[in-house]
């Protein structure tokens, strides 16, 4: 009975995160198309927030359904690796499109690739340690059994 209730919670949370991902992606796209300058302050603020939230939503979906994570097998190393890959992709998009994608990191380390990479890695570890950006308990940090 408990397993069935955990499964229904995971399904409901997955649906919620998919909806959040779609909304954040659409907001990001509208901002990208409608903003006259990709270097304007409103563009940076909105894209930082929406792209970061979209990444977090996708990673929560991965965490909820990852068999390693659900069984508690190598959850830290496997899931941090997935998180690191996702943020690395965001960094590559940053260089390709010349706009700030992942979070607030670009504002603090605009020109130093190594500092940016280190900051993203520590930020991903912080998310996995138990809290997301709003201070809520992260689904990724606690394996469901």
UniProtKB/Swiss-Prot annotation:
Coiled coil start-end: none
Membrane topology of this protein: Multi-pass membrane protein
Record's subcellular location: Membrane
Keyword Cell membrane: no
Gene Ontology biological process terms in this record: meiotic cell cycle
Chief localisation class: membrane
Transmembrane segments: 18-38, 95-115
Function: Has a role in meiosis.
The protein's name: Meiotically up-regulated gene 124 protein
Organism: Schizosaccharomyces pombe (strain 972 / ATCC 24843) (Fission yeast)
Gene: mug124
């Amino acid at each position: 009975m408990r397993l069935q209730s955990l499964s229904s919670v995971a399904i409901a949370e997955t649906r919620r995160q998919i909806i959040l991902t779609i909304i954040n992606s659409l907001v990001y796209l509208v901002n990208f198309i409608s903003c006259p300058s990709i270097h304007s302050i409103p563009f940076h603020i909105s894209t930082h927030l929406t792209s970061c939230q979209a990444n977090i939503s996708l990673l929560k979906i991965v965490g909820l359904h990852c068999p390693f994570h659900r069984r508690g097998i190598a959850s830290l190393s496997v899931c941090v690796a997935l998180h690191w890959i996702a943020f690395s992709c965001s960094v590559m998009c940053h260089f390709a499109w010349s706009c700030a994608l992942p979070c607030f990191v670009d504002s603090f380390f605009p020109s130093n690739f190594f500092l940016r990479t280190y900051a993203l890695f520590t930020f991903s570890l912080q998310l996995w340690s138990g809290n997301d950006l709003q201070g809520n308990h992260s689904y990724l940090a606690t394996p469901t059994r």
